[in-house]
């Protein structure tokens, strides 16, 4: 899986052998400041390119969602469903609930900071795929996996929850989804995709 923020990076990911890509549109994603973003008008073309090359497309809607963001969030998720993206990647219960209500598949973002099997059991009602907290070590990931198997923790499709994790990324002293330093120092919220990496 590779992040993309432009058609050039999309083609580079495909040529590099990615089996899936993730991207954001319209600002409600954690990559809103770190890359160019597509618009809802790009969705169909991105999905078509991905299908043509046999790869999956995941749309990130993984920021904190405030009340004033709800209309835009619904518009983005509606557009994702219409364009037939493989799934959205969400971190806010509002996005999870809305996507589930319209039949759009959801994967859970690392921004939720799921770091144990009890938290995973709670969120399993929303998604079949969970991206675990970046702060976990391999032993902790294995323990969560073992509990999924032992306790038969399933998602909406009735299948065992699949877990994913980041192998690299922004190295930060803060816990994912819980940082306020960038907002305090630079008036740019890391929890809204605008981390200044200070």
What are these regions (language model features)?
Residues 130-131:
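Acidic, glycine-enriched active-site microenvironments
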Residues 127:
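A conserved catalytic-loop motif detector
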Residues 1-114, 118, 139-141, 145-198:
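Active-site pocket-lining/capping segments in soluble small-molecule metabolic enzymes
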């Amino acid at each position: 899986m590779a992040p993309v923020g432009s058609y050039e990076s999309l083609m580079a990911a495909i040529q590099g052998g990615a089996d899936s890509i993730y991207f954001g549109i319209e600002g409600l994603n954690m990559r809103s400041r770190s890359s160019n973003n597509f618009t809802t008008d790009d969705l169909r073309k991105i999905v078509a390119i991905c299908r043509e090359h046999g790869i999956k497309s995941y749309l990130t809607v993984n920021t904190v969602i405030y009340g004033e963001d709800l209309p835009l969030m619904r518009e983005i998720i509606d557009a994702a469903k219409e364009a037939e993206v493989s799934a959205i990647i969400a971190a806010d219960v509002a996005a999870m609930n809305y996507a589930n209500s319209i039949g759009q598949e959801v994967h859970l973002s690392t921004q939720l900071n799921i770091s144990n099997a009890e938290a995973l059991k709670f969120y399993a009602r929303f998604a079949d795929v969970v991206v675990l907290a970046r702060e976990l070590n391999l032993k902790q990931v294995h323990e969560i996996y073992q509990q999924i198997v032992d306790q038969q923790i399933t998602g909406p499709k009735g299948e065992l929850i699949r877990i994913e994790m980041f192998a690299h990324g922004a190295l930060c002293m803060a816990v994912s989804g819980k940082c306020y330093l960038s907002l305090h120092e630079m008036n740019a919220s890391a929890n809204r995709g605008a981390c200044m990496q200070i």
